[in-house]
Amino acid sequence: MSTHINAKMGDYADTVLLPGDPLRAKYIAENFLENVKQVNSVRNAFGYTGEYKGHRISVQGSGMGIPSMSIYINELVREFGVKTIIRVGSCGGIAPDVHVRDVLLAQGSSTDSAVTVNTFGPGFHYAPLADFKLLDTAYHVAGKLGIETKVGDIFAADRFYNDELDMEKLRDYGILGTEMESAGLYLLAAKLHFRALSVLTVSDLIFGDEKATAEERERTFNDMINISLETAIAGK
């Protein structure tokens, strides 16, 4: 048991899928895993452990933004020995060739969050990156499933509502999409020495009107979930 997780040691698998939305965690557990056990309910940040094709997998809701997510990552890794974390979440599409429901694999994550500066000090701009083996596996798994993915840089915003941010410049520099977590995930992976990858579904477009409904975000991002689960068990 930790401060924000009321599970026991051994309740979590070595690999955890980490959606921000606790209801998405519940959806994954109920629709993709077998022999499911709920292992966390503190603050309604639901956590579950079950089996996927005979392999033990956990899923844990982490909330919105780097500060909330960092709490769960630190406790999962430090207190429960988790070795691999795959973020499954939504993002806003930025690049011209990105469309709603596209699946993005975050090779790296730029950010305007102070988390990297607070870690390394001013003047050093750390570049948070995914685990290459996980990234490569996810890309090839998606191909075998017939799911097209786009691989590249994701922008992890410190604020959801940010009128000062120059989205056109992000687009010009090839940023695929924006969310609020991946840079923190990759930074903590480097610090705590676990494997990490963000697999994201585009829920809306920054430069367009197309968007997925809240219900669709919760229940129909199955391509992202299938890629993540197959990546989690690859080679086991």
From Swiss-Prot:
It catalyses: a purine D-ribonucleoside + phosphate = a purine nucleobase + alpha-D-ribose 1-phosphate; a purine 2'-deoxy-D-ribonucleoside + phosphate = a purine nucleobase + 2-deoxy-alpha-D-ribose 1-phosphate. Belongs to the PNP/UDP phosphorylase family. A purine D-ribonucleoside binds at H4, E179, M180, E181, S203, D204. It is an enzyme of class 2 (transferase). This is Purine nucleoside phosphorylase DeoD-type. Its EC number is 2.4.2.1. Homohexamer; trimer of homodimers. One of its GO terms (cellular component) is cytosol. It holds the Pfam family PNP_UDP_1. GO terms for biological process: purine nucleoside catabolic process. One of its GO terms (molecular function) is purine-nucleoside phosphorylase activity. The keyword Transferase applies. It comes from Limosilactobacillus reuteri (strain DSM 20016). InterPro entries: DeoD-type, Nucleoside_phosphorylase_CS, Nucleoside_phosphorylase_d, Nucleoside_phosphorylase_sf. The record marks R217 as: Important for catalytic activity. It comes from the Bacteria.
